[in-house]
């Protein structure tokens, strides 16, 4: 059954909705009653206005004219029109307005009925009429004390045929108006009651009863919104407890850290995703797990068997402190190379300037730091990692070589020993030489100035052009005295440096050799890449090494003197020199692949020849002492070779090395 166009909402919010259409079927008689009452009011209003105007036109008496309730008729007609609109558009506001007008019409109709009825009785009582000119004057039938015109109680009626007919017509009109006003009052009262009942009944039903949706061609099919919950249901549901929705689960952020991603973060200034998450609450991995070392590789920092009585070393005039809370590692920039070329991917630079550095601790700390923009960088000088000191001048253009396999004549110990590494080598001045930011070097405060300051090194040429050393010859510091012994143990649990006793000194000298991890031949890496870096340190009275938890704890040490090493013949500095001028390629093999076997204790060889003995723990000292700092970290292959190559190579290699370019050779 299709609803009529009048089926619309009747809610208090005056909006058409499905709820209004639902109750139209139930309350159709109420709507018909509204329509009927509206029409009756309109009709009564018209009649009241008409009779009142006719009655006022018949008589000339001012009191009767003023008492004709024409104003009640106008209000009654207007109220009826609103009633008809409320039937057409049964909005709550329209119905409420109709009920308000109905109440007003009740009052006006009552007043008009009283006035009209009074005038009708007056016309009925004035029966004695006389024609005076063109006006009929009627007086009451009861004899008055004074004449009728003098008393003012006369009725003047416009003459028709006779005066009695004119008086009767006026009387009938006034009674009609009186009856109409009374009927209007009754109709208006009914209209107000019906409107009030409809308003409150609809609101009461919608409040206490659930709703039913009615869909039809006139209704918005598929577009109806769910009605609000009824008040009755809401009141009944108050006793039911509805638990709140729990918050979403919290997952802590993942902190990823690896050496390769740290290096790439430095190079590209961005974060890299890593498949290995490290949470702040997790314990850091062991040093052996990170570096792929055996447990016995951290027995001691300086092996006493490496001590040789015939060896001479420079005195260390600086104190090495372990800063547990030092600053971040910053990549050391590589100087401009002549010819507009740049270092290759695997070029590494490492230099030792007379300070004992705990490389293992630095490597451990640098790997464990999470995404701080540091990997394997170097920053040295007489200052901490956070202390800025302007460089005196731009470092000279570094000398480079396309091979690390050429031996070099030992330079004077006043100059730092440059590290040979992949493809191109950088020779740095002493004021910008790399060091480890976890280890600070400070001049002693109480013992006077150091006897051997870092000398200024002149710019050098390519190793293929000159076979001289990196420092000018002739700079020879005095010979030192024989130092007392010192043994520096290396702990498994803590990668820092600890001292065995306060009175202990350096007893041993060490010669550590870093060997090539893998020789890669590709379009990017052409040539041999040997990361064998030779560190020379002779017997010398050592500074006291302190284990510090902050960078503020320092201890002054006495000043020492440096002892020069005798210089040998100037060697070649490039692979081209070796191939062109040297007889044989055994030296290239010797520098690329260094033996792991223990050398002959006889120590035969040329002057200055030093055999590197096998360490007590079965591995060369390079893994626990030296750190290869990556010069170009844009490729992940270099770091992968640096950090994981040690686990891949477990074969036996030669370990024999000549400091002064001796003729001793060993096979691969």
Swiss-Prot record:
InterPro entries: CD20-like, ENTREP1-3. Glycans are attached at residue 160. It comes from the Eukaryota. Residues 655-668 have a biased composition (Polar residues). The keyword Phosphoprotein applies. The modification Phosphoserine is found at residues 358, 389, 493, 574. May interact with WWOX. This is Protein ENTREP3. It comes from Homo sapiens (Human). The lineage of its organism: Eukaryota, Metazoa, Chordata, Craniata, Vertebrata.
């Amino acid at each position: 059954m299709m609803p009529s166009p009048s089926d619309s909402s009747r809610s208090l919010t005056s909006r058409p909705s499905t709820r209004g259409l639902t109750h139209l079927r139930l309350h159709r008689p109420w709507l018909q009653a509204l329509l009927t009452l509206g029409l009756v009011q309109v009709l009564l209003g018209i009649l009241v206005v008409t009779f009142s105007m006719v009655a006022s036109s018949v008589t000339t008496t001012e009191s009767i004219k003023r008492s004709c309730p024409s104003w009640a008729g106008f209000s009654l007609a207007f109220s009826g029109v609103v009633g008809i609109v409320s039937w057409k558009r049964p909005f709550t506001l329209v119905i409420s307005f109709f009920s308000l007008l109905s109440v007003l019409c009740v009052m006006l109709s009552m007043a008009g009925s009283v006035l009209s009825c009074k005038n009708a009785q007056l016309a009925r009582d004035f029966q004695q009429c006389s024609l005076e000119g063109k006006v009929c004057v009627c007086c009451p039938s009861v004899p008055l004390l004074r004449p009728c015109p003098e008393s003012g109680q006369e009725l003047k009626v416009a003459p028709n045929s006779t005066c009695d007919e004119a008086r009767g017509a006026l009387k009938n009109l006034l009674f009609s108006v009186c009856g109409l006003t009374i009927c209007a009052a009754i109709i208006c009262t009914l209209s107000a009651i019906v409107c009030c009942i409809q308003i409150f009944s609809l609101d009461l039903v919608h409040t206490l009863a659930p709703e039913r949706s009615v869909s039809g061609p006139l209704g918005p099919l598929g577009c109806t919104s769910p009605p609000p919950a009824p008040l009755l249901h809401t009141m009944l549901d108050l006793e039911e407890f509805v638990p709140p929705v729990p918050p979403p689960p919290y997952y802590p952020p993942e902190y990823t850290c690896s050496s390769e991603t740290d290096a790439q973060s430095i190079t590209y200034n961005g974060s890299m995703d890593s498949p290995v998450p490290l949470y702040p609450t997790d314990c850091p991995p062991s040093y052996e797990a990170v570096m792929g070392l055996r447990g016995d590789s951290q027995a001691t920092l300086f092996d006493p068997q490496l001590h040789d009585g015939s060896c001479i070393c420079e005195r260390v005039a600086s104190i090495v402190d372990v800063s547990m809370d030092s600053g971040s590692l910053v990549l050391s920039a590589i100087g401009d190379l002549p010819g507009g070329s740049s270092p290759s991917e695997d070029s590494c630079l490492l230099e030792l300037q007379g300070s004992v550095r705990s490389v293992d601790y630095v490597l451990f700390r640098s790997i464990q730091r999470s995404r701080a923009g540091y990997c394997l960088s170097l920053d040295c000088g007489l200052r901490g990692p956070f202390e800025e000191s302007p460089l005196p001048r731009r470092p000279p253009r570094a000398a480079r070589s396309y091979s690390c396999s050429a031996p070099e004549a030992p330079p004077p110990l006043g100059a730092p020993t440059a590290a040979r590494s992949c493809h191109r080598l950088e020779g740095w001045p002493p004021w910008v030489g790399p060091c480890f930011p976890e280890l600070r070097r400070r001049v002693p405060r109480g013992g006077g100035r150091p006897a051997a300051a870092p000398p200024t090194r002149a710019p050098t040429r390519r190793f293929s052009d000159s076979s001289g050393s990196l420092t000018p010859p002739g700079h020879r510091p005095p010979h030192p005295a024989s130092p007392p012994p010192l043994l520096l143990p290396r702990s498994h649990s803590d990668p820092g440096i600890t001292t065995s006793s306060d009175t202990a000194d350096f007893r041993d000298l060490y010669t550590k050799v870093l060997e090539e991890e893998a020789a890669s031949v590709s379009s990017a890496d052409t040539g041999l890449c040997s990361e064998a870096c030779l560190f020379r340190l002779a017997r010398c009275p050592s500074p006291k090494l302190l284990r510090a938890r902050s960078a503020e704890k320092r201890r002054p040490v006495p000043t020492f003197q440096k002892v020069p090493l005798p210089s040998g013949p100037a060697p070649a500095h490039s692979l081209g020199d070796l191939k062109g001028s040297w007889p044989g390629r055994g030296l290239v093999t010797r520098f690329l692949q260094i033996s792991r076997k223990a050398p002959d204790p006889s120590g035969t060889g040329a002057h200055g020849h030093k055999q590197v003995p096998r360490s007590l723990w079965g591995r060369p000292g390079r893994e626990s002492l030296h750190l290869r700092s990556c010069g170009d970290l844009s490729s992940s292959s270099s770091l992968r070779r640096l950090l994981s190559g040690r686990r891949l190579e477990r074969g036996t290699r030669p370990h024999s090395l000549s400091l002064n370019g001796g003729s001793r050779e060993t096979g691969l």
